[in-house]
């Protein structure tokens, strides 16, 4: 049964996988939670090599300088699987853990925000001298569908990938 087929109450009360399961079974294995009540994806082509796009994404401490809504970001070490990081998005504190760190091709993490659990993936693919960037995210947990909407998440992903494109093309 798809999220759209579930009743309002079913979407509102969706608990979904534990954070550990989301991290180990979903994010590390190339997927978001397709059953989550909040899902979105966005794709953009950036006129810059994937190495330059990667440098922007992987430098989490610099996110506040170019990612809309991010005011603080701190990584506890070098980017690597299972390394935690904390950041502030639109005034809300997010606790995240990197799941996949494949230079030039994928940066994925799991995180918690206001009682919700999310999986976020950035996928980079070379495309004739440019880079195709796909961003996808799922947000689940009790009341996630009431606190947030797929449309709102779609707008956030579009803003983020748009800023990534602008920043990478400016430096590239």
Where are the model-predicted features located?
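A conserved amphipathic terminal alpha-helix motif
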Residues: 10-25, 132, 138-172
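Glycine-rich portal/gate segments that line the openings of hydrophobic small-molecule binding cavities
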Residues: 8-14, 45, 64-65, 74-119, ...
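Short, conserved loop/turn and helix-capping segments at secondary-structure boundaries
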Residues: 57, 114, 150-154
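Hydrophobic ligand-binding cavity/cleft-lining segments
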Residues: 2-77, 163
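Compositionally biased, charge-rich terminal segments
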Residues: 1-5, 132-136
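Alpha-helix N-cap/helix-start and coil->helix boundary motif
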Residues: 50-51, 60, 92, 140, ...
């Amino acid at each position: 049964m798809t999220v759209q087929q579930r009743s309002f109450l079913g979407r509102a009360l969706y608990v979904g996988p534990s954070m550990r399961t989301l991290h180990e079974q979903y994010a590390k294995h190339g997927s978001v939670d397709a059953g989550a009540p909040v899902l979105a994806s966005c794709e953009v082509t950036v006129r810059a090599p994937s190495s330059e796009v990667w440098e922007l994404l992987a430098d989490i401490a610099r996110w506040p300088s170019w990612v809309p809504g991010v005011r603080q970001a701190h990584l506890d070490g070098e980017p690597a699987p299972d390394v935690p990081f904390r950041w502030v998005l639109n005034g809300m504190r997010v606790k995240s853990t990197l799941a996949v760190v494949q230079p030039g091709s994928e940066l994925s993490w799991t995180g918690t925000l206001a009682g919700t659990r999310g999986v976020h993936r950035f996928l980079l693919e070379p495309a004739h001298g440019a880079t195709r960037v796909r961003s996808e995210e799922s947000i689940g947990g009790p009341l996630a569908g009431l606190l947030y909407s797929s449309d709102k998440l779609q707008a956030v992903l579009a803003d983020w990938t748009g800023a990534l494109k602008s920043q990478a093309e400016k430096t590239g």
